[in-house]
Amino acid sequence: QQEAQHLLAHRAHVDALIKRYPSLQKTLDNTIQHYENLYEKECLDYHLAYVAGEAAFAPFFGMCIDNREAFFRKGDANVSSLFLWHFCEEIEHRSSGLKIYNHVVGGWWWKIRKLPSMIRHIEECFAAISRDFQKHVPASDWGNDINVFSNPLKDVSIKSRLRCVVGVLAAQMPWHNPAHTSVPGWVGKWSDSYEENQDMARFFGSDEP
């Protein structure tokens, strides 16, 4: 139920963006096609390794949660809450992808060899989306966030960045167990609030228009 609600929230966010900036429909279509092309090009083992590789970035999601004040406090509560919801779910499911890969494929070295191409695919996708947003969203609508793509970590401490990098690198090791990854305490607060039926759609962020 939680994932279904989360999916609908993502879809509503995308629809709202496209309604305001119709040119972003092409961005969505291109992004979907970007993954369709990869799906047709690569084998099942690769796709399972891709999912397992993404799970290794739990330390990055943790960094985003730990620095939620810098990243999300001033943002629209609907959007800030959606992203934090997403990061909490990624951490919650951090073991799933690797477990499936190890059961179906196995082979740590094969997964590591494919990691650069997976990172390149994600970077290409993000770069294309970034270009389109800067092209189709007027500068007047960005406010103080106009440079978000050029320096997204400007308000994150060096210590927090280093902890993230070390965590991501450690997650590539063959003995890594995602279940042992350090989890931000705020994830527990989020889960407890969800169980208490609080409004998670506006759980964090600014109420200012």
Model region roles, listed by residue range:
Residues 1-209:
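Non-heme di-metal
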